Structure formats: structure tokens, C-alpha cells
Amino acid sequence: MGLIDNIKKEAMGNRTKIQSSDAAELEKILNNLFYLDKNIEEETKFVEQVMTRGLESQERVGLHASAMLVGEKEFCLRAQVLSLIYKQSQGEQVPVGLMRIFKQGDAIHEKWQRMFIRGNYGSARDMDRTRVCDEYMLSYTPDLDVKIPKFFEGRMIGEIKSVNTYQFQRMTKHPSAWKQAQWYMHLCINRLKKLGKWNVKDYTKGFVLSEDKNTQDFKIEVYDYDSSLVAPFVDRAESIMYYYNRVYEQHKMVPRPKDATSPECKRCKDCFMREACWGIGKGKIKIKE
């Protein structure tokens, strides 16, 4: 075991934070947000935005950026292609225990988003705003799209995560949020490049803010954009578009994975495209074009 590993092990035993100098600097800046007065006008806009979010349509349509980030065992190319053609299963009612957890997570997100507004690091429209990548027929919704001049001269993507105390005390970084941060940075950079508006700095840095939902302590991870880390996600998105176009050009659908043996098998029973894939329930209902 190397020196760094020993330091990490000892720190976890002592419940000590391990952060880069960048992360420590950003944490200090964010701690100052707790002392600021409310920005009534902009926070009111944000609250209205939160309260009216999703009223236009409750139906899930198209790809979501997070679908590119799952592990190999969870990723299903066929399901993603089907989701661009047919309606998705909207799911059963979520158990109340899970709803309580979701609501707590929402509250933590909204608290931080309002504080970033107070710091004048972003406006209401920079918080939880869904964007669309036409190239991949894909939507993505960064928690934060902010600019903190004291820390970095460009705009940054930020992801907020609420975690339990056990996980918070033991983790040196959030297990999956770095993927979101890198992927969203990539999508934002590409969008600006296509518009001819990228200034070389924006979205080349991002961060993850993890809060202990019991103690309100928080940790920061800072990341520089790395195109090599998002290459697998880009490959998946491009594969989906290739096979989607093949459906119309060659009338061939992606075959099911080998372990997708029946609608009731472990691989398929909770799939969001199960009905369209197997022709059961409501079956294949085409999305209106």
C-alpha cells in the first residue's frame, strides 16, 4: 500500500476530509454563502420555476444523458433505440419511503441552488435547466451552471448529491457523480462550439458537492474536463443514433441482450421499454413526431 493510500485510510478512520487544494478553496468560498442576504427577486423566480417544473408534460420522451453512464450490465442498446421510437412505460407509483428520500434530496438541491443565486454566481435559469443535444436526441439537466470569478474565470457545471452519514464519512469521492460532471461539461462545450461561442475556458472545470443529509456537512470534488473520460459515453450515444437510423434505413431493430430471455426475467422485468420490446401490456405505441 502506497503513502497516499495510507493517508486516505487513516483519514477515513479519523473521519477527516481528503480534498485537493482546489476543493478546499472552493469549499471556503461556498461556506461564505451561508452569511449572505436573500436575493428576493431572483430566488422568487427560482421557486416559481421549481413549482411549475414538468407541468407541460409528465411523459418521458427521448434519451437522457444519465442513460449513457450506467454500467455495462445495466446498459441496453435495444432499450435506448426503442425509446426514440415508442412510448416508455411510465412506471408504477413510487413507494412512500422512497418518496420521502427523494423529497429530502430535492430540498438539499434547492437550498444550494438558492445560495448560488444569493452569491450572484448564477440566475434562476442556470439552475436545473434542461438542455437538448439534437445530435444525439438527448436531454441533460445540470444541477448548477455557474460562474465563480474568485475561483475560476469560466463557467462551471456543478452536481449536488445528498448522501447518508455512513457513506459521507467513508467516501473520498462520490462513486458516480464525476461521470455526470464530465459528461455535462462535454455536452455544454460541444453546444457552444456548434454555436461558435466557446471561449476555451467555459465548462473546462466542474465540481461535485456532496452533503451529509444528517449533519449538513459537505465535501467538494473539483474536476478538469477530460475528453478521454467521456469517450465511452460518446461511443454509446453514437451507437444509439447509428442503430436508430438503421431501423428506418434497413428496417432492422437491435437484438435483445443474451440475458433478456423473457419479459419476466431479471434483466427485463423493470425495464422502462419492456412493453414495447416484448409487445405486452400497452405494447408498441409510437411517439408522435
Language model features by range: what are they?
Residues Y86-K87, K161-T165, E211-T215:
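Short connector loops/turns at beta-strand edges and beta->alpha or beta->beta junctions
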Residues M1-I157:
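Metal-dependent nuclease catalytic cores that hydrolyze phosphodiester bonds in DNA/RNA
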Residues M115-G119, L187-K194:
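Active-site catalytic microenvironments for nucleophilic, acid-base chemistry
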Residues E92-Q93, Y166-Q169, F218:
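Short small-residue beta-strand/loop micro-motif enriched in glycine and branched aliphatics
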Residues A107, K111, K179-L187:
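Short amphipathic alpha-helical face segments that pack within enzyme cores
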Residues Y136-K179, L192:
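Non-catalytic protein-protein interaction segments used by genome-maintenance enzymes to assemble
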Residues I18, R170-H174, I189-E289:
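Metal-dependent nuclease catalytic regions and adjoining charged, substrate-binding loops involved
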Residues I157, W183, F207-V208:
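Structural beta-sheet core signal
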